[in-house]
UniProtKB/Swiss-Prot annotation:
One of its GO terms (molecular function) is GTP binding. NCBIfam families: GTPase_YsxC, small_GTP. GO terms for biological process: division septum assembly. PROSITE patterns: G_ENGB. CDD domains: YihA_EngB (cd01876). This is Probable GTP-binding protein EngB. It comes from Geotalea daltonii (strain DSM 22248 / JCM 15807 / FRC-32) (Geobacter daltonii).
């Protein structure tokens, strides 16, 4: 996917504040500190399009970004951070289900997991929601440079078994060495309308 430009559109907490659903959307979901911001920044070849919060999980906002005027990238709020107030945790479920259930232009969700961690209840809940609403999940396993080849194989089997999927459905990624970047773009292009998806490739450097 050749990235010509990426622009922030707006943040929202409820459907009434979402931007118009004129373009197909690809959303990114995952627990706090899973590497979601780094994944998005690498994919669009920007250093700080999405910034990592100093208080992970505390800001419960859905952030929308225009990509090339062709589709919308949606950064969903992280979940599972232990220090988040209970009231904030309770907001996450209804906010996510409302977005997934009512956003008709949502074409796929990148569900992000850390290679070193076993999926948590919220990861499984998110996958079940996607399956219930017939939304294509793209499973991305981050921080793969932090484990050995043998450990990657072992953890992949644990993650797949916990989620109830095949290991072949897992897409491996490293923000450090860019492993998996082109493959993930191909997975995204598979769920975008044909007229939107371009050929996978290196995005131009940001100016």
């Amino acid at each position: 996917m050749l990235i010509k430009y990426v622009e922030f559109i707006k943040s929202a907490t409820r459907a009434a504040h979402y931007p118009p659903g004129d373009l197909p959307e690809i959303a990114f979901a995952g627990r706090s500190n899973v590497g979601k911001s780094s994944l998005i920044n690498v994919l669009v070849n920007r250093k700080s399009l999405v910034r990592t919060s100093s208080t992970p999980g505390r800001t419960q906002l859905i952030n929308f970004f225009d990509v090339n005027g062709q589709f919308t990238l949606v950064d969903l709020p992280g979940y599972g951070f232990a220090k988040v107030p209970l009231a904030v945790k309770k907001q996450w479920g209804p906010m996510m289900e409302n977005y997934l259930a009512k956003r008709a232009n949502l074409r796929g969700v990148i569900l992000i997991l850390d290679i070193r961690r076993t999926p948590v209840a919220e990861d499984i809940q998110m996958l079940h929601w996607l399956q219930a609403y017939s939304i294509k999940p793209i499973l991305v396993i981050t921080k793969c440079d932090k484990v050995s080849k043998n450990e990657r194989g072992k953890q992949s089997r644990i993650i797949a078994q916990t989620l109830g999927v095949e290991t072949e459905e897992l897409n491996f990624f490293s923000a450090l060495n860019r492993e998996g970047k082109d493959l993930i773009w191909r997975r995204i292009e598979e769920v975008l309308p044909a007229e939107t998806a371009g050929s996978a490739g290196e995005a131009p450097k940001a100016t």
